[in-house]
């Protein structure tokens, strides 16, 4: 693949974001369009640099990683738990959980409710209030491109599907294991 660096006008910004674990999605207009238009060049360049650029058909790009650092594992667990609890909460309140995940603003009141109802789970992650959840999980999700801050709270973005996929895999493995017993 011939790579014309002059065409990759946002290479530095894209590399910095992806290298920090950020997921570039359609809301990241300029970077998203450039990746979309020059995907072959970016894939070849990042591959030569030792990165595995992934494009998810649900609308986002990211570097595949093994998430081997202990700290990233803790962050991922906190995000996964929050997503799982949100899905459960929306289902319990009679909403379509998948629609609500992406359509509802996650405000401080909701965060406080989630922490109170699931205190035993959040305590293990040292999250004791809605403010802790906001600071330790939601602001981290913004830094990773999984959510964006809006007036009154946060909106989840398409890259959250990576966590939903992982939760579904765990769920399927649990059922398979139970069936085999």
Predicted regions located by residue number:
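Minor-groove-contacting beta-hairpin "wing" of winged helix-turn-helix DNA-binding domains
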Residues: 60-64, 153-158
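Short, amphipathic alpha-helical interaction segments positioned at domain boundaries
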Residues: 74-78, 159-181
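Eukaryotic partner-binding/assembly regions in large regulatory complexes
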Residues: 1-73
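Leucine-rich, amphipathic alpha-helical/linker segments
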Residues: 11-25, 91, 97, 101, ...
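Short acidic, hydrophobic short linear motifs in intrinsically disordered regions
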Residues: 21-30, 99-125
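A short, conserved structural fragment
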Residues: 49-55, 138, 142-152
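Short basic alpha-helical hairpin corresponding to helix-turn-helix/winged-helix-like nucleic-acid-binding
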Residues: 55-110, 117
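Short amphipathic alpha-helical interaction segments
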Residues: 34-42, 125-143
């Amino acid at each position: 693949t011939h790579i014309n660096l002059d065409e990759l006008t946002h290479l530095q910004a894209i590399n910095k974001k992806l290298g920090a674990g950020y997921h570039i999605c359609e809301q990241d207009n300029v970077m998203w369009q450039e990746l979309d238009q020059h995907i072959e060049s970016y894939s070849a360049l990042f591959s030569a640099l030792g990165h595995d650029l992934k494009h998810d058909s649900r609308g986002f790009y990211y570097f595949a990683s093994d998430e081997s650092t202990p700290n990233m594992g803790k962050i991922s667990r906190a995000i996964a738990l929050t997503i799982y609890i949100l899905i459960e909460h929306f289902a319990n309140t009679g909403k379509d959980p998948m629609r609500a995940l992406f359509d509802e603003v996650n405000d401080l009141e909701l965060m406080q409710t989630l922490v109170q109802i699931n205190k035993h789970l959040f305590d293990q992650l040292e999250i004791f209030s809605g403010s802790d959840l906001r600071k330790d999980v939601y602001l981290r999700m913004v830094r990773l491109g999984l959510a964006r801050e809006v007036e009154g709270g946060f909106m989840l973005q398409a890259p959250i599907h990576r966590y939903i996929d992982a939760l579904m895999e765990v769920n399927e493995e649990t059922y398979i294991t139970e069936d085999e017993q």
